[in-house]
Amino acid sequence: ISSCLVSRMRVFVLTLLAMTAFAGNSLLSRLALKDTSIDAASFTSVRIISGALALWLIARMRGGTHSASGNWLSALALFLYAGGFSFAYVSLPAGTGALLLFGAVQVTMIGYGLWAGERLRKRQAAGFMFAFGGLIGLLLPGLSAPPLQGSVLMLGAGVAWGVYSLRGTSSGDATRITAGNFLRAVPFAGALSVAMLPWASLDSSGFWYAILSGAVASGLGYAIWYTALKGVRTTSAATVQLSVPVIAAVGG
């Protein structure tokens, strides 16, 4: 088997794992914010803190340099995504939220790729049109239109995640950089929780859902995604994320 084929298979497997983790995030978040009493700000904080701890442990076990990685701009994008994501899922179903999120991701990343001079292939153009058409169809007034506030929050989260993904395409050590971004996002999450303290609410089920979302679906999932991003073009990275709403819808 050629090294090129092995490399492509590795990227495919990593991408599949990352997309499954992303869908798991939608399902866990919706489950926690719909079926438990945890509030969106607390969910966001627990998710980011548990993701930071999980990634720090993984980075420590892998050894290598112990210097700080990541940067504050990526951390801010990560926090804006996580916060908007949580507050949006208070009112949105998992599948609808995922479609809005990754439709916005698609438009953001492909738009940047075109601006940077990348050419759009046929399947990527089809994915772009599907995402754009899906967003328009969802947001048009009608019986099936999702709540406006939740939709706007999720679209904002999608743009933030698109920016975060774009900033990860040229990364070095994916795990260490993602860990650094999560650690830097903790103060932002803490400030949000303090601001929302009068509405804070925690329960054990919601707490554990947030930990699973942070440590497994977010921390580990994002580290895998950053690794996979090294082997795909910006426009392809955007298109493949359209699989997430399908996985989330099938999962519930």
For each of these PLM feature ranges, what is it?
Residues 10-13, 41-57, 127-130, 149, ...:
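Hydrophobic alpha-helical transmembrane segments of multi-pass integral membrane proteins
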Residues 97-104, 168-187, 218-252:
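Helix-helix packing/entry segments at the starts of transmembrane helices
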Residues 42-53, 78, 86-119, 157, ...:
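Specific alpha-helical transmembrane segments that line the substrate/conduction pathway
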Residues 55, 78, 120-140, 156-158, ...:
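Hydrophobic transmembrane alpha-helices of multi-pass small-molecule transport proteins
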Residues 23, 27, 49, 56, ...:
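Hydrophobic/small/kink-forming positions within alpha-helical transmembrane segments
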Residues 21, 62-102, 108-110, 130-137, ...:
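Specific transmembrane alpha-helical segments of multi-pass solute transporters/efflux pumps
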Residues 1-45, 76, 80-84, 133, ...:
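Glycine-/small-residue-enriched transmembrane alpha-helix faces in small-molecule transporters
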Residues 67, 98-102, 115-137, 144-151, ...:
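Loop-to-transmembrane alpha-helix entry segments
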